[in-house]
Design a protein with these regions (language model features):
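Active-site-lining helix/loop region of Rossmann-like oxidoreductase modules
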Residues: 9, 14, 144-284, 289-290, ...
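N-terminal Rossmann NAD(P)H-binding glycine-rich loop of SDR-like oxidoreductase domains
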Residues: 6-26
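C-terminal helical cap and adjacent loop that interface with cofactors, partners, or active-site loops
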Residues: 271-351
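Conserved Rossmann-fold cofactor-binding substructure of NAD(P)-dependent oxidoreductases
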Residues: 53-69, 75-81
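ADP-ribose/adenylate-binding Rossmann-like module
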Residues: 89-107
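Short, conserved SAM-binding/catalytic segment
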Residues: 42-49
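Rossmann-fold NAD(P)-binding glycine/threonine-rich loop
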Residues: 101-122
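N-terminal Rossmann-fold cofactor-binding loop
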Residues: 33-37, 55-56
Length: 351
């Protein structure tokens, strides 16, 4: 069967809907898909796009839905619960796969399908959004400046905007789990916010703390640098509170606590408004050093995380549909280079 279509699974989520809305700007006509027929059909009718309704639970049914699909954009998280089924179906049907995951464990899991994906002649690219395009490109940019770098620090500092239901749900599902760093090539569990760092942006010292961001996995694949930490902007008062989170991890992992938090999430707006996104921006900072003590730094500015995710997914989709891809497991920068981020609107490298 000739495969020419793009399928966007999880189109009714906040980020999925953004991708669907912007698709026309990239000359892409996705098939919208998901489990909720009421929401998917309403969105499809509003955007005048085709749609399909199916779940990920039945492997045979899922593969049947992908028979005529060339590429899946997977936007239905949490990906720890949904990624495996879709990846395996894509490999079985020779369908390319990208997603908007940012979970370290999911990157590591999908990486194990590299050989199977190559044999099926398909590309697997988790993290084709804000997690991790800007930071992945910054990591490779620094690696090229200092090829023998042994340590990498990355930081992102959002200004304005707010998080979506989906992102908040993923965060809630990981409450009490702590953080992660990469040391000597190995993933090492750490307390959340085990380190703080003052990042110099245009002469201003901005406070950041460590978080378990996807680059702990992906930047290692992209650069081979064996020691990696990722930081995000945080108020010092919040950081001091989080330093003691380990005392409460046992209760944060309880289902009744997570259910209560999920109810609070569901009562909030789905995500930032178009106006909030238009004025929000993100600064990405990176630093590498080697055994000789030589140091290189880089600063990048880009739009808010949700806009970068939608534009980034569609840019990569456009490239894949033109045959511009590498088979097997890939990261955005390992496939498309350090300047991929500069092809996304409102992005510029400051240094």
């Amino acid at each position: 069967m000739h495969k020419i279509q793009v399928l966007l699974y999880g189109a009714n989520g906040y980020t999925g809907e953004l991708i669907a809305r912007y698709a026309k700007e990239y000359s892409i006509t996705p098939v919208l898909a998901g489990r909720n027929e009421t929401l998917i059909r309403a969105l499809a009718e509003r955007l005048q796009l085709p749609y399909r309704i199916f779940s990920l639970e039945n492997a045979n049914q899922l593969q049947q839905q992908l028979q005529d699909i060339q590429l899946v954009i997977h936007a239905a998280g949490p990906f720890a619960n949904t990624g495996k089924q879709m990846v395996e179906a894509c490999i079985a049907t020779n369908t390319h796969y990208i997603d908007i995951n940012g979970d370290i464990s999911v990157f590591e899991r999908i990486k194990k399908y590299d050989a199977a994906a190559k044999q099926a002649n398909v590309m697997l690219m988790p993290g084709a959004g804000f997690d991790v395009i800007p930071t992945d490109c910054t990591a490779l940019h620094l690696k090229e400046q200092l090829p023998d770098a042994t340590h990498l620090q990355l930081a992102f500092l959002p200004k304005g905007g707010q998080i979506s239901h989906g992102t908040a749900t993923t965060m809630a599902s990981r409450l009490g789990e702590g953080g992660t760093a990469r040391e000597n090539g190995k993933l090492v569990s750490k307390p959340l916010g085990h380190r703080s760092l003052l990042v110099d942006i245009n002469g201003k010292k901005l406070f950041t703390m460590t978080i378990p961001w996807g680059d702990i996995s992906t930047a290692y694949h992209t650069t081979g640098i064996e020691n990696i930490e990722v930081y995000t902007g945080m108020k010092p008062t919040v950081y001091r509170f989080l330093k003691f989170q380990f005392l409460f991890n046992w209760i944060l992992r309880k289902q009744f606590v997570r259910s209560w938090i999920q109810q609070k999430i569901n009562s909030r707006p789905a995500g930032p408004t178009d106006e909030q996104r238009a004025t929000a921006k993100t600064t990405v900072w990176g630093k590498v050093w080697n055994a000789k003590g030589e140091i290189k730094t880089s600063v990048l500015e880009c739009a808010d995380g949700y806009s970068v995710t939608a534009w980034g997914c569609l840019l990569i989709t456009q490239k894949i549909m033109k045959g511009d891809l590498k088979t097997g497991y890939q990261t955005p920068a390992s496939c498309y280079g350090k300047d991929l981020i500069l092809e996304i609107p409102k992005s510029k490298r400051i240094s």
